[in-house]
Every structure is written in structure tokens, then in C-alpha cells.
A protein has these predicted regions:
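Aromatic-lined, polymer-binding surfaces characteristic
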Residues: 199, 229-232, 589-614, 618-627, ...
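Catalytic cores of carbohydrate-active enzymes
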Residues: 676-677, 795-910
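Secondary-structure capping and boundary motifs in well-ordered enzyme cores
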Residues: 226-230, 244-247, 471, 635-642, ...
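Long, charged, mostly alpha-helical binding arms that flank functional sites
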Residues: 26, 150, 202, 539-542, ...
């Protein structure tokens, strides 16, 4: 039935009320100042019996740090349930962060709760009960990984419960504050009195704003009054001392306290010019609570009407959203409308008879998502060309990037796998309803560098095809309907720190914040369309000047859209002019085919065949090498080790790509033999970090040896490349834009320098670990310069063995003898100092303590030490024992996953 919602607040209290015959209810909130606790009281009217769910996501970190990578930040949240006091606690590992705790005021209530949102995915939640757990949890939860505080009460007549939330410096402090809060009585405070003037002003602001723009000439009349001209302006002409002035001031203050930006200008018509009684009257009205807002941007100004020219007064009348006179202000008696965005139809669950655990099917060329089945997590798909790409899921259009998926996101990004994120939407309007065509799709196919969403609305089928252009920095979207021409819309979110304008039917936009790589984004539509930047105007036809979206809207049965980026405005317009010229998805298919090896695995296991024949090569080429991004993390940079690892796969399908990348990596090596751990292209030059990592540089000689073995192209060894130049870092790493050397050396010498740089060993004769090895998360184990890595030691021996044929090819017998001896010494040290009963250990830290041994309380077994021992030595008694130990300890049969190591680090600070 019809439901209306109201919200009131005053000081430290608020109230939300639902007025519905079906379910009238309210939530009242307050702060218990004596114990620094938030209290939320719920109740439903009448004799209804109900349960109440209360949930939030604990962050416990500074917003900017959390926002930089929410999923990574969430890994460090832990939960603990005190069953005696019935309090749920949250903390962030590492110290220096606040604690958080939640409880019910009534200790007789035994609630259900969860501290983790692993079971929640936006497109699988059909009702609120899906958010809450099925049983009461016991204490001792530990790491949450994906934290969520969700509490569900038992049924109670009247639905009256009080939830208490507090923060403190320790678990003990939180407990004490909640215990004090439980002794308090919840009393609803009086909320602020109604303010119909503020309601009227808000309604005019949302619905009555004119289209008058603000030029520099126009704005000068506001700037001289210290008004900004960038927020909505209300103007009142004052002819006499009247209560209308105080009502206007009260409306202004109410909007300010509700965080609604506005400016207020009083134009005074003085009859007595010398004494100015009207100005004095207004100043007297504003001496107290309004004083902080006087004559400043976003505030209140008083000016003589005679000081404005006739043209300026005419401009103010056109520009102001509310222009009134002090003797003619009206107070409406009827309720005023507020803009409520229409519901955009998305996921609608279907009922199936058979039990289904997975909603995806696979074959040798792609993935099919069938919406008749359940999905417990999003399935993501990366599409990329040489200059741009996109990450989508089976229910959303994700985000678009230009060149660098981290630094140059054309549309907004959210890596939260549990949310329904819509940075871009393609929406169809049919019979007054709006449908998100990705979220509403009944079938999604990821195949050959394309995503195809299909379904039907009101009996009319549709198909939405998405792909990245191979050479153009753009992503295209082709939409086709059968037998109907709906309103088709491409909608992009627009934040407050973005600027945008329309140039010949093309949206151009850029980020006003400082960016390491500045760029201009663009959006284009193939058809004649309306360009809109206001969601209220797009959906309701009312220009509220919200400036919250960029959108195209057209009525057609077939349309193409494009989104992309370029270094500047003119370049963006040139690229846009080349987009939306027909179906060019064939070039995306050809690009993918070029980078997928022609071999096919035939093992008798269809899933395994699909993995090795298509999925792994596709992920390697498109997601890792060209896109350098995924759903969870958008790196955007070249990783020295990362993309060289990918070359071991790419060499089978695109050896020329591998050749170019080997030369690129040589150009990012220092003369000392170490390398830039990662870097990205910036206007001032390639920028990244120089580290003391122990293994990344070893992938250069390994990849070169593999490339020559697979292609026979030994000429690459004679190509001369320069080095990066800077002082070696004193500590673990340094972020820099280094210079380039004038001198050059052959690729072969680059490889020799890499091997020579890896010769350094510690007290046990093993390779020094430095600031990390393959596992970047172990960055503190050897940061003091004494820790040793068993993994890097095995890797060094393996690389020397693989590079030996290249040294023979170059007839470099001195290097052959030297590195053979170094390798033999490492193997001897490994067998003497790195085998612990039934496993190879992982490392020695700076203090000489064993990591990955039988007696290690954390990380007692690590897969890398066993795997690389077997890869290097083959089948020996010790390698078989190590692999068996790792299999028993690390393989999770239920999840069918291998842990990297176990138990996880909890007390020992391994780094990262």
C-alpha cells in the first residue's frame, strides 16, 4: 500500500517514521553523552508482533585509507562475542585504531547475529531475512575477512527494542560504556518544530530552478557581497520591518542544519538612507545564531537594492530559485512534493524445482550465466584492448578505464563483491517503468572478448553487447530490441569533484582532483538524443539542477553508446568521432584469438579442459597483461615480475608481444641489477618503486631463456637497452621517477647483471630476502638485511639452470663456471639448513628465527618452499615428503582450494 516516510532531527536526536496501514513503525535515535553511546529505539504500532534487524559495516579506519582499497582494508577486522554480557565487539588488527561494540539494552534478549557478509550478495538477496544468520553464534569469532555487524532480535509484541553502539580505545572501555548505557532510560527528546518556510524553499530549490546560467559578468554582483554564486540562491526584497525576515532566516538555518547548501540575499529598499533602519533591523535579527553565516560564501548577505543596476536586478530575479518580497510571502497549507528517484528494475529471482549450487556453465570458449539458477557471488569479466578496457559482472556494467585501471578510471569503481554496484547503467524505459538491462538480464554470455546480456521485457526480447575497441581508447555498447522502441538511456554517475560539458552531442568530463595521469573522458551516442545531467530531469522531467549524472536518452529499437578517454579535449572528440560506426565486435574477437594459444587440452574433464584451453590464457592476456586489472583489485601498473610471469603463457600465442615486453623490462632495470618493482606511465616519465625485493629481477633471465627456447629468436640478446638511474634505497623501497642512463648494454648483459645481483647470501648460505620475495606480504621478515628466503634460493638455482643454454649460446664460459658454482653452493645450503623433518622451511627472519618449520606457531608449512624444490630437483625423497606435508596441511577439500601457508600470521608481524 501507500507508505510515506518522515524524518526529524534536533541536536543529538533524530526520528524516522513510516506511516503505512500495513506496517506503521518508527526508529528514534539519541546519544548518551555520559557514556559515548548511540542508542536506537524501534517500535511498531498496534498489537503487531515483529522482529527487528540492525546492521552496519564496521570500518574502524580513516575514511581516505579505507576508500583507497575497501576490500583490502576489511581483511584486518576481527570480531569477538562476549556471551556473558551479550556484547559483540569489533577491532582492527595492528593497534592504534578504535574498538566498536554493539548490544541490546535488554540483557534478557538472546539475539542472532553475524560478523561476516560472506553469505550476502546484492543480486542473491530476495528478502531481509537473507541478510541475517540462521542460528545464534557463539563467542570466539576471530577474523571476519568481510565484516558485517548484523543483529536480529526474536519476535516481540510492539517491536520495541533499544540497540546500543559505542566506540572506545579498548574492548574493556567499550564494555564499560555499554554497561553504563544499559542503566540509562531511553527517553525521546522533542524534535525541532515544523518549518513550512524551509519546506517551501526546498521544494522550489528542487523543482523551480530556472535554466539561467552564471557568467563572469553576472557573478560579479554576487562576489562583491562575498556570495559564491555556486550554490542555490534565495533573494528577498525588504520594504519594511516584518516577521517574514525571521521566517526566511529560520528556513535558511533549517536547510543548513540538514546539510542543504544555499545562500540568502536581502535586498533592502531604504526610505531613510542615512540611518538605514531596515539594514539595522536585519543585522539585529542575525546577531546571534546567524552571525557565522553573514557575508561569506554559502551564507547570508544584506545589500541596498539601489547599489545594483537594473540589469543586475533582472539577472537576480532570473537566477534565484526563490525570489520574494517581504510583504508578500505565502505559507502553503498543502504538503509539498519531494523528488524521489524512480525504482530501476533489476534482479528478479526465479523459482526452480532442482537444487542448484552454481549459476554458471562453462565450455572451451566462454561462460554462460543462466538467471534461472542461483548466484552467490558476482562473476566478473575483463575486456581490454591496447588503450582502454572495462570490468563487468554478470549483473552490472562495472567500470571503464583508459590506459591505467587505477590512475585513469573513466567511470567510478567499487571492488566490493557483496554490493550491487552501478557506475554505469544502460536503462530502458517502458510504460513508465525503468529497467537496468544488465541487472534485469535472464542470460549473460562472456565469450571472445564480448559480454552479451539478453532477456525480455513485456514480451519483447533485447540484447546488449559490450566490448572494448582494440586500438581506440573506448568501450562500446550495442543495444537492440525486438518489436519495440523504448526510451534507451546510458547513465554515468557524476560526483561533485567532476566537471562536465556537452560538445556537439558528446559528453566530455574530467576529474578536478590531482591525478598522476590527467585525462579527459567522453561519452557518445550513435543516435539523435537528449543529453541530460540531472536525474530528476531524466526520470521526472523536472530540472532540479542536481548535476548528479551524465546521460543520453533516445527513443529507438537499436542504439550504440561509447565511453572512453584521451589525453585532452580535442583528442577525446577525435576518438569519439570514430566510435559507434557499426558493429566492430569482430575486431575484439580477433584480438582475443590472437592472444589465445591454439592448443586444446583434452583430459576428459570438461572443466579442466576449459580452464587450460581458454580461461587461464584469456585471463593472462586480457586481464593481467593488457588490462592489468580485475574485479577485486585494479592495479593498472606494470609489475616487473607479474607481466614477465604472463609471458610464459603469451609466448605460445603472441611471441612478438613477449619480445616487446622483455625489452620494456630491460629498460626498467637499474645498473646494479635490481629493477623497478612496478611502474606506470606518467607525463613526467615512468613512475614506480625501487625496492630491495629478492626475486623480481630473476624473472628477466628466466623469461629471456624461455622466449629463445620457444621461438629460436636469439637476436634479442644483442639488442642494446639503457638502464634506470638513481641511488639504491637505504630502506625497503622508494617511490620515484628515475632518470635514464645514456649508456646501453645488450639484453644478455641485462640478464647477467640480474643474476649477479641475486648472489648475496646470509648466515645460512641462502639468498637474502630483502624487502620481500614472491610473497609481498612478507615484507618485514628480511627488511633488516639479514633475513633469508628459501623460495628465492630455489628460484635462483632454477633460473641459473634455465639460463645456462643461453650462456653456452653466447660462449660465455666464465659466466657458466661462476653461476654453476653459485647454484651448487645454494643447493648444498638448502639441503643442510632448510629441510625440517618432513618439509622445507619458508625463510629465516632477521633474528635468525625459522619461518615455516614444524615448530613455527604460525606459517608452519608454506607451499612455495615445497613446490619450487620439486620444480628444481624433481622427484627426491625430500621433495615428495614436502609436497605430501603441504597437501595434508594446506588443501581444503570442502572449498577445493590450496592455502598458500597455514596457520595464518596473527601475532608475528610479517609485513605488508
Amino acid at each position: 500500500g501507500n507508505t510515506s516516510f518522515s524524518y526529524e532531527h534536533s541536536g543529538s536526536h533524530f526520528a524516522c517514521t513510516s506511516s503505512s496501514a500495513a506496517f506503521p513503525a518508527s526508529v528514534v535515535g539519541t546519544i548518551y553523552r555520559g557514556c559515548r553511546t548511540f542508542a536506537f529505539k524501534t517500535r511498531c504500532s498496534g498489537d503487531r508482533t515483529c522482529r527487528v534487524g540492525f546492521s552496519f559495516v564496521p570500518i574502524l579506519a580513516r575514511q581516505e585509507e579505507y576508500s583507497a582499497h575497501p576490500s583490502f582494508s576489511s581483511l584486518f577486522i576481527e570480531a569477538d562475542y562476549d556471551s556473558t554480557e551479550r556484547i559483540l565487539h569489533f577491532k582492527r588488527r595492528g593497534g592504534g585504531f578504535p574498538y566498536c561494540a554493539i548490544a541490546l539494552s535488554d540483557t534478557d534478549i538472546l539475539p542472532q547475529f553475524t560478523a561476516c557478509k560472506d553469505h550476502i550478495y546484492a543480486h542473491s538477496v530476495k528478502e531481509m531475512s537473507d541478510v541475517f544468520p540462521l542460528k545464534i553464534r557463539s563467542e570466539g569469532i576471530g577474523a571476519t575477512i568481510n565484516p558485517l555487524c548484523a543483529i536480529l532480535t526474536p519476535e516481540r509484541k510492539g517491536g520495541e527494542f533499544v540497540f546500543l553502539v559505542t566506540c572506545g580505545g579498548s574492548k574493556k572501555e567499550c564494555t564499560e560504556q555499554l554497561l553504563r548505557a544499559r542503566r540509562k532510560r531511553f527517553t525521546r527528546q522533542h524534535t525541532a518544530p515544523p518549518c513550512p518556510e524551509a519546506d517551501e524553499m526546498l521544494a522550489k530549490m528542487l523543482f523551480s530552478r530556472p535554466s539561467e546560467g552564471l557568467s563572469d559578468v553576472d557573478s560579479s554582483c554576487l562576489w562583491r557581497l562575498s556570495l559564491s554564486g555556486t550554490v542555490p540562491l534565495a533573494v528577498m526584497e525588504v520594504y519594511e520591518e516584518t516577521s517574514a525576515i525571521s521566517r526566511a532566516l529560520r528556513a535558511f538555518l533549517r536547510l543548513k542544519t540538514a546539510f542543504v547548501k544555499t545562500e540568502l540575499l536581502f535586498l533592502v529598499h531604504e526610505k531613510e538612507k542615512y540611518s538605514s533602519p531596515l539594514r539595522a533591523f536585519i543585522v539585529e535579527q542575525t546577531e546571534s545564531e546567524y552571525a557565522p553565516f553573514m557575508h561569506r560564501a554559502g551564507g547570508i548577505a544584506v545589500a541596498d537594492a539601489d547599489s545594483f543596476s537594473a540589469e543586475e536586478l533582472a539577472f537576480l530575479k532570473r537566477y534565484a530559485f526563490d525570489y520574494s518580497e517581504s510583504d508578500s510571502i505565502e505559507i502553503p497549507g498543502a504538503a509539498l512534493p519531494l523528488y524521489v528517484p524512480p525504482k530501476i528494475m533489476g534482479y528478479e529471482p526465479k523459482t526452480v524445482a532442482a537444487e542448484v549450487k552454481n549459476g554458471f556453465s562453462y565450455d572451451a570458449s566462454g561462460v554462460v550465466s543462466d538467471e534461472i539458477k542461483e548466484h552467490y557471488m558476482p562473476y566478473s569479466y575483463v575486456m581490454a584492448g591496447y588503450a582502454a578496457g572495462t570490468v563487468v559482472t554478470h549483473k552490472t556494467l562495472g567500470f571503464v578505464f583508459w590506459r591505467n585501471a587505477r590512475e585513469c578510471r573513466v567511470t567510478s569503481f567499487d571492488g566490493n563483491p557483496y554490493a550491487a554496484y552501478y557506475g554505469i547503467r544502460i536503462v530502458a524505459g517502458i510504460a513508465g517503468r525503468f529497467f537496468d538491462l544488465a541487472a534485469f538480464s535472464e542470460k549473460t554470455v562472456f565469450e571472445g572478448g564480448k559480454s552479451v546480456y539478453s532477456g525480455s521485457i513485456a514480451g519483447h526480447g533485447y540484447e546488449l553487447k559490450v566490448y572494448a575497441r582494440t586500438k581506440l581508447p573506448a568501450v562500446e555498447y550495442r543495444l537492440k530490441f525486438d518489436g519495440i522502441s523504448p526510451t534507451c538511456m546510458l547513465i554515468k554517475e557524476q560526483s561533485a569533484d567532476m566537471t562536465a560539458d556537452n560538445k556537439g552531442g558528446v559528453w566530455l568530463f574530467s576529474d578536478m582532483r590531482h591525478r598522476a595521469v590527467p585525462f579527459v573522458g567522453f561519452m557518445k551516442c550513435s543516435e539523435k538524443c537528449e543529453t541530460v545531467n540531472d536525474s530528476a530531469l531524466l526520470f521526472c522531467g523536472v530540472d532540479a539542477q542536481r548535476r548528479d549524472i551524465l546521460a543520453f536518452s533516445c527513443t529507438t529499437d537499436e542504439v550504440s553508446f561509447a565511453i572512453g578517454g584521451a589525453p585532452g579535449r580535442e583528442a577525446a572528440l577525435r576518438v569519439a568521432s570514430l566510435c559507434c560506426r557499426g558493429d566492430t565486435s569482430g575486431e575484439a574477437e580477433a584480438f582475443v584469438k590472437k592472444h589465445i594459444p591454439g592448443y586444446r587440452l583434452q583430459s576428459g574433464n570438461a572443466g579442466l579442459d576449459a580452464l587450460f584451453s581458454h580461461f587461464a590464457p584469456y585471463q593472462t592476456a586480457i586481464s593481467r597483461f593488457f588490462g592489468k586489472t580485475g574485479f577485486y583489485q585494479t592495479g593498472g601498473a606494470f609489475g616487473f615480475r607479474d607481466q614477465l610471469q604472463d609471458c610464459f603463457c603469451l609466448v605460445y600465442s603472441s611471441p612478438e608481444t613477449v619480445r616487446v615486453h622483455i625489452l620494456r623490462c630491460c629498460a626498467h632495470q637499474y645498473r646494479e641489477g635490481d629493477v623497478m618493482h612496478w611502474w606506470f606511465r606518467a607525463p613526467q616519465g615512468d613512475t614506480g618503486i625501487r625496492t630491495k625485493c629478492s626475486d623480481d629481477f630473476l624473472y628477466l633471465p628466466w623469461a629471456v631463456a624461455d622466449y629463445i627456447e620457444k621461438t629460436g629468436d636469439a637476436d634479442i640478446l644483442n639488442v642494446r637497452i639503457g638502464y634506470m638511474e638513481s641511488l639504491p634505497p637505504e630502506s625497503g623501497e622508494r617511490y620515484e621517477t628515475p632518470a635514464r642512463s645514456e649508456s646501453r648494454e645488450s639484453v644478455y648483459m641485462h640478464c647477467i647483471r640480474a643474476l649477479a645481483n641475486g648472489e648475496k647470501t646470509g648466515s645460512h648460505g641462502l639468498s637474502l630476502m630483502g624487502s620481500c620475495d614472491w610473497n609481498d606480504g612478507m615484507s618485514r621478515i628480511g627488511s633488516g638485511g639479514r633475513g633469508e628466503s628459501v623460495f628465492t634460493s630455489w628460484l635462483y638455482v632454477l633460473v641459473c639452470r634455465e639460463f645456462l643454454p643461453v650462456m653456452k649460446l653466447m660462449e660465455d664460459y666464465r659466466s657458466i663456471a661462476h653461476f654453476t658454482a653459485v647454484s651448487a653452493g645454494l643447493v648444498l645450503a638448502l639441503e643442510r639448513n632448510a629441510f625440517d623433518g618432513d618439509r622445507y622451511i619458508r625463510a629465516y627472519d632477521d633474528a635468525g628465527r625459522v619461518i615455516g618449520g614444524r615448530n613455527s606457531p604460525e606459517c608452519s608449512v608454506d607451499i612455495l618452499g615445497q613446490a619450487f624444490a620439486a620444480m628444481t630437483l624433481g622427484r627426491t625423497e625430500r621433495t615428495v615428503s614436502g609436497l605430501d606435508t603441504a597437501y595434508r596441511a594446506l588443501f581444503d577439500r570442502k572449498a577445493k582450494l590450496f592455502r598458500l601457508f597455514d596457520p595464518p600470521f596473527d601475532r608475528y608481524d610479517a609485513g605488508y
